[in-house]
Curated annotation (Swiss-Prot):
Keywords recorded for this protein, A-Z: Amino-acid biosynthesis, Cytoplasm, One-carbon metabolism, Pyridoxal phosphate, Transferase
Any one GO BP annotation for this protein: glycine biosynthetic process from serine
Keyword Magnesium among record annotations: no
Pathway(s) served: One-carbon metabolism; tetrahydrofolate interconversion; Amino-acid biosynthesis; glycine biosynthesis; glycine from L-serine: step 1/1
Swiss-Prot/TrEMBL site (Plays an important role in substrate specificity) positions: H227
GO cellular component term, pick one: cytosol
Chain sites annotated for binding (6S)-5,6,7,8-tetrahydrofolate: L119, G123, H124, L125, S370, P371, F372
Protein name stated in the entry: Serine hydroxymethyltransferase
Assembly notes: Homodimer.
Reactions catalysed, as given in the entry: (6R)-5,10-methylene-5,6,7,8-tetrahydrofolate + glycine + H2O = (6S)-5,6,7,8-tetrahydrofolate + L-serine
Major subcellular location class: cytoplasm
Residue intervals passing through the bilayer: none
């Protein structure tokens, strides 16, 4: 990573970048929503594309001089369509939350009912949490998981849908280790006349690799982030499998009168000028690069290894007496309920950080602790797999995590963390990342 100019011009920021580079290269990243982009993606994101304003869409901009950023955006859109096998893509959302906001704004009016997975059961803020716009502008109702299994019960989903009759059902999660039955969700939505949105921000990379069920044929809208398992730059995206007339009946004037706008037209207008102005063209260029990478055969090998590593870790944790919510994992993550280990999520996160392992504390279903403490931790394998780690490494990592958690209430905990940190550093240095070396 070439930083010689930054070092000369701004030593304080340079130092922060150096320290973050050391953290990423010499400690173990197990946060399920994080990954490492390629050097090509980073170069695109750090390119002259960052200088260009480009309000509007390719061929229909409000600014001149957009002919080359148009190329980048068209590449991103075309590659995403091929990757997800969809007919419509908007690559301009700055984040997954922005993408979700655009969808909700495009089909709902304030006060309309929505239904999504409860945040404390593994959902996301934008699926109806009362602290988020989605729970403040709309009447939000939440489905959850069964206490006995930790899994979503479609009978419970249907019962709630019939009771509250939402206009939009959201299926997706940020801390749920099983898959979603998109076909069953669509059948429920159709029976009550609701629209269906899939938020696949977490498993998108596994979905395009064919390792999890595809939401595009079943859902009216599909949103995702472009990082996480897709391994691109931080950003969002909206997709549709097919177009249809917008349900709000928004019209547009024509030479002969007016017509109802198609949903894709409404969606584009909701992203810009609805909730955003100028798109981040350097990030869109990075998205285009990442989508090309995900279209290569080796990306499926990567995604398959992500899933294998997660399965091995889940099995190893279970053998050591840990409780995994839902009983295991079918994707890239797992949620550990630490209550039988007499350690809360906050303590575990802090001790593992001290030991060179980055995870995040996370509420578990029916948690009796606050979101700032929690009873669990969330663990994911995308970043470690990008480094080239495999099943044997996964088992070793679980053993190291167990050493730290088991020592949490003992006088030896600091020594244990220090020794584990040394082992983690050695493991990480055995799996270096191309392009992450500092070259001032």
């Amino acid at each position: 990573m070439d930083t010689d100019i930054l070092q000369m011009q701004d030593k304080e920021v340079f130092e922060a970048v150096v320290n973050e580079t050391v953290r990423q290269t010499e400690t173990l990243e197990l946060i399920a929503s994080e990954n490492f982009t390629s050097r090509a993606v980073m170069q695109a994101c750090g390119s002259v594309m960052t200088n260009k304003y480009a309000e509007g869409y390719p061929g229909k901009r409000y600014y001149g001089g957009c002919e080359f950023v148009d190329v980048a955006e068209n590449l991103a859109r075309d590659r995403a369509k091929k990757l997800f096998n969809c007919s419509y893509v908007n690559v301009q959302p700055h984040s997954g939350s922005s993408a979700n906001m655009a969808v909700l704004f495009s089909v709902l009016k304030p006060g309309d009912r929505i239904m999504g997975l409860d945040l404390s059961h593994g959902g996301h803020l934008t699926h109806g949490s009362p602290v988020n716009f989605s729970g403040q502008l709309y009447e939000a109702h939440s489905y959850g998981v069964r206490r006995e299994t930790g899994c979503i019960d479609m009978n419970m989903v249907e019962e709630l849908a019939n009771k509250v009759r939402p206009k939009l059902i959201i299926c997706g999660a940020s801390a749920y280790s099983q898959g979603f039955d998109f076909k069953a969700f669509r059948e429920i939505a159709d029976r009550i006349g609701a629209l269906l949105m899939a938020d696949i921000a977490h498993p998108a990379g596994l979905i395009v690799a064919g390792l999890l069920s595809d939401p595009v044929p079943h859902c009216h809208f599909v949103t995702t982030t472009t990082h996480k398992t897709l391994r691109g730059p931080r950003g969002g995206m909206i997709m549709m499998g097919s177009d249809f007339e917008n349900p709000l009946g928004i019209t547009i004037k024509t030479k002969t009168g007016s017509r109802v706008k198609m949903m894709t037209e409404v969606m584009d207008a909701e992203v810009m000028p609805g909730i955003q102005g100028g798109p981040l063209m350097h990030i869109i260029a990075g998205k285009a690069v990442a989508f090309a990478e995900a279209l290569r055969p080796e990306f499926r090998d990567y995604a398959l290894q992500v899933k294998k590593n997660a399965a091995v870790m889940a099995d190893k944790f279970s053998s050591l007496g840990y409780t995994i919510v839902s009983g295991g994992t079918k994707n890239h993550l797992m949620l550990l309920d630490l209550r039988n280990k007499n350690v809360n999520g906050k303590v575990a996160e802090n001790l593992l950080h001290q030991a060179g392992i980055t995870v995040n504390k996370n509420m578990v279903p029916f948690d009796d602790k606050s979101p700032f403490v929690t009873s669990g931790i969330r663990i994911g394998t995308p970043a470690m797999t990008t480094r080239g780690m495999k099943e044997s490494d996964s088992e070793r990592i679980v053993e190291l995590i167990d050493r730290v958690v088991s020592a949490a209430e003992t006088p030896a905990v600091d020594d244990v963390c220090r020794l584990v940190r040394q082992e983690i550093r050695e493991l990480c240095l055995q799996h270096p990342m191309d392009g992450y070396e500092m070259t001032p």
